[in-house]
Amino acid sequence: MSQEISEDLRDELAWFVQTYSGIVDFELDENLDPKRWFMPLDSYATRKEAAHYFLLVASLSDYQLTGNPRNIRLLLHHLHETFGKRIYTSTDPVVFKSGVLSYEQKMEIFDRLGQAKGEIPEVLCSVNVFVEKKARGDLIEYADGLFQKGWKPKDFAKELSYSVKRLNKHNKAKCWLYLRWMIRPSPDLCLFQFDPRDLMVALTTPKLRVAAALGLTSNEDMVFELNAKEMPENWWRDTAEFDADADRLNEFARSLFPDDPARVDFPFFILGTWLEYADLTPTFLMKSLRFLNQKHEELLQPLMRYLTVVSHYNRVGEVVPPGAFSGFEFDVYDFLRSKGVLFNYEFMEFCLPAENAGIDRFLTYKPDFLLPQFTDSGRKVILEPHGVGKNLKDVLFKLSVFRKHYGEFFCLILIVPDTFLQNIQNLDPSGNSYDYLWKQSDYKIQFEHFHKS
């Protein structure tokens, strides 16, 4: 049930939002690969295309459809390479089916689409039908027309929820995600004329975690249900309950930023992702906020950023296909898949201070395998297979810096070839670079023991 939120917690949240609201949304970030073919938005034609493209993005922002959010950019890039401008004009799902299938085959050792991936072609076509029939091919002009009539963003959201597949009921949160991108100023796109004060925060699962930790949800068991290993299929179907929770979260957002409540939207996504499978209490929320705010002050930049695809190269300098690129990594990847373990592969990059490393720049660390459902003393587990002997000292140093700054929240398991053990113990006798050190020859047995414990 709703509870009193302390002033200290409100202040930490406001500070966090003010800091992280200047960060470009993961889906809008043009520093990530692959690059969008229509950027920059320096003409009406490119802005018009962006309005259509990002409606496709929002419609696919559904774990059941696309799995990891990075798949959306990668899938649409693949479909554009395959079909060109037909990704905006096709209204026949059959056209897209082959493209979705070829994407999965291409990305087999990188990531997987969601369980409802078979609906992706129909979702894309329903967006195109809406743009063609309702908006007459121009979403910016359509939105401007609604604005001139005195309509509000909620009216546009209602039109979308009636017309586009999987944008109704609880999925209408995706309408608000789209409208936030289209209406808010930079780092959003500001393509529509509506007033940002009329926006709502999209109640997606990460933001529901924040709401639950704040005590804003009506269901007292929500903090436990959000951390269930397997949430039932009907979990989101109580639309009235989640509408009420969305209203409370938005009321809270307006109390922080009355002229721009959706300013909290992406910061709360970041915070809610941090809270995945964590203790959803005000105490742990405050602990996390203080850590994130303090580290940002130290680093003067965000602690982490989300990645799409990280380029790797073979020995002759050629880019290799996305995914677990070494035999060792692929063995771990395949093992985790065979065990049904949920993991994120190279999905996040952490910022690290230089720590007197003799360099004048920040270090970064990209975990190979983050296992969000596994914890060790309340910390999320990272598996780091490393089979390259070159620069081993530098690798151990980077891992030790990561553990020094993030070890309160993450447990790092380093997996290495058996022949590396003695060298690692010589280079790092105190074990500062890992919580656990496993041999390649028996890491599967070690994992089973770890899992049971």
Model-inferred region functions:
Residues 1-311:
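HhH-family (HhH-GPD) DNA N-glycosylase catalytic core used in base-excision repair
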Residues 313-324, 337, 342-377:
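Active-site metal-binding core of divalent-cation-utilizing nuclease and nuclease-like domains
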Residues 415-453:
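Domain-level recognition of nuclease-like catalytic cores that cleave nucleotide substrates
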Residues 301-331, 335:
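Interdomain/boundary linker segments immediately adjacent to catalytic/signaling cores
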Residues 319-320, 366, 370-397, 419-421:
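Short beta-strand-loop-alpha-helix junction that forms the active-site gateway
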Residues 350-362, 389-393, 419-423:
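Acidic-and-aromatic substrate-binding clefts and catalytic sites of carbohydrate-active enzymes
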Residues 379-382, 409-414, 435:
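Hydrophobic beta-strand segments of well-ordered beta-sheets in folded domains
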